[in-house]
Regions:
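Transmembrane alpha-helices of multi-pass inner-membrane enzymes
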Residues: 24-32, 164-215
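Hydrophobic transmembrane alpha-helices and their immediate junctions
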Residues: 46, 141-168, 324, 337
Length: 394
């Protein structure tokens, strides 16, 4: 029955098209097999190694080729993240540092490498798709070494458990560690719960009679964690409710609720962006600009820059609006809208030369995917402007 269940699970993973899950499952199975001494000796034999190493390399290549653009996009993220890591080696940017600064570094990297093959793959990014890189960027070498020391300590304790518990907990831990190389499982609260349960079981089971000494500090930490989670969940839940009401057409009604929540969630970039967007939608451009500038300290991406640009545009600050549109275009060069807005701003002020420059920038872009109607309309307008200017200049 176990083998049948495992087969169904493997088929499910394949159909889910999750490369990280497939790789994690494969490694987890190898860990389970490796725990058996007889199987371990077979796996480590020269004949098996000679055959298995090329197969493993082939598997990794096939996993890469399965979604090559997605994989290359992650390579770009990791490359830019390395630039961030070099900037603050020891202690990193602090909690939320990646989210606050990554897009600035991506904009600089792509500006410095205009012929990069990654240009069309660049997009809005809020996570490096690698928990280890996230730790390096946010907490530097010191934080990363603490993480590695904790992982090693857990595995040392795992080896002290009886065979059945050791196999189950080791395979679960390995799955989490492997998936963390290619995704962001720890953004899910459930994964934190599972990880905490694994650590507590390992600590209590491996210490035997000494486990009573660990009960008090672990219980205190667990209760403290639960209290902090609940306290942070309450405003999140209230925010979710008023956001839903806003989507149902009650934006003006819920703006006072957003303002009230602002004091409690002023360090949450996603909340600040949502609040700024609601103010922008309702026409409160000055207040929206203020909130979005706060937001850029915690979350600064293409969408934030586009909203900032539109606020400046509506407040009559054309030059700053153009700067924001240009910065948004540098962040995600494949987007057509920033240069389109710049083209229209210059046209509105009678600056035909710069309007044509923006139009040519639009026409020079490669299309990331098949053209949507909106993109095709932008291209048509840019072509029409260039043709009109060329015709009248004769």
């Amino acid at each position: 029955m176990w083998w049948l269940a495992a087969l169904f699970y493997f088929v499910f993973i394949c159909f889910s098209e999750s490369r990280a899950s497939l790789l994690a499952t494969t490694v987890s199975v190898l860990v389970i097999l490796y725990d058996n001494k007889r199987i371990r000796n077979v796996l480590l034999s020269r004949k098996v190694l000679v055959v298995s190493i090329p197969l493993i390399l082939l598997l990794l290549y096939l996993i890469y080729r399965f979604k090559a653009n997605s994989a290359n996009g992650r390579l770009l993220i990791w490359r830019v993240s390395f630039d961030m890591f070099k900037e603050k080696l020891l202690f990193g940017f602090g909690p939320g540092g990646f989210l606050a600064h990554y897009m600035d570094y991506q904009a600089n990297y792509l500006s410095d490498h205009p012929d990069s093959p990654f240009l069309l793959l660049a997009d809005n990014v809020n996570n490096p798709f690698n928990e280890y890189i996230l730790v390096l960027v946010n907490y530097g070498i010191v934080g990363f070494c603490c993480l590695m020391a904790s992982i090693v300590a857990v595995f040392k304790r795992l080896l002290l458990l009886d065979e059945e518990k050791r196999i189950i907990l080791s395979s679960c831990t390995v799955v989490l560690l492997v998936v963390s190389f290619f995704s962001y499982p720890f953004s899910n609260p459930f994964v934190w719960v599972v990880s905490t349960v694994i650590i507590m079981i390992v600590l209590f089971e491996s210490t035997g009679k000494k486990s009573g000494l660990l009960a008090i500090p672990i219980s205190v930490c667990s209760v403290t964690g639960i209290i902090i989670s609940v306290l942070s969940f309450l405003p999140e839940r209230e925010w979710q409710v008023i956001s839903q009401r806003s989507l149902m057409g009650e934006t003006e009604t819920v703006l006072p609720d957003f303002r009230r929540l602002h004091e409690r969630m002023k360090n949450n970039g996603s909340f600040l962006y949502n609040f700024g967007a609601e103010l922008h939608y309702s026409g409160y451009f000055e207040e929206s600009l203020q909130i979005l500038e706060e937001c850029s300290s915690y979350l600064n991406d293409y969408d934030v820059q586009m909203l900032l640009a539109d606020c400046h545009q509506n407040l009559g600050d054309t030059l700053t609006a153009i700067d924001c549109y240009n910065y948004a275009s540098r962040m995600v060069p494949s987007k057509f809208l920033p240069q389109y807005q710049i083209m229209n701003l210059y046209l509105a002020y009678g600056d035909t030369v710069n309007a044509v420059n923006a139009a040519n920038a639009i026409l020079a872009k490669d299309v990331k995917v098949s053209r949507s109607k909106a993109v095709q309309r932008i291209i048509n307008e840019a072509e029409s402007l260039v043709k009109d200017v060329m015709f009248h200049s004769r």
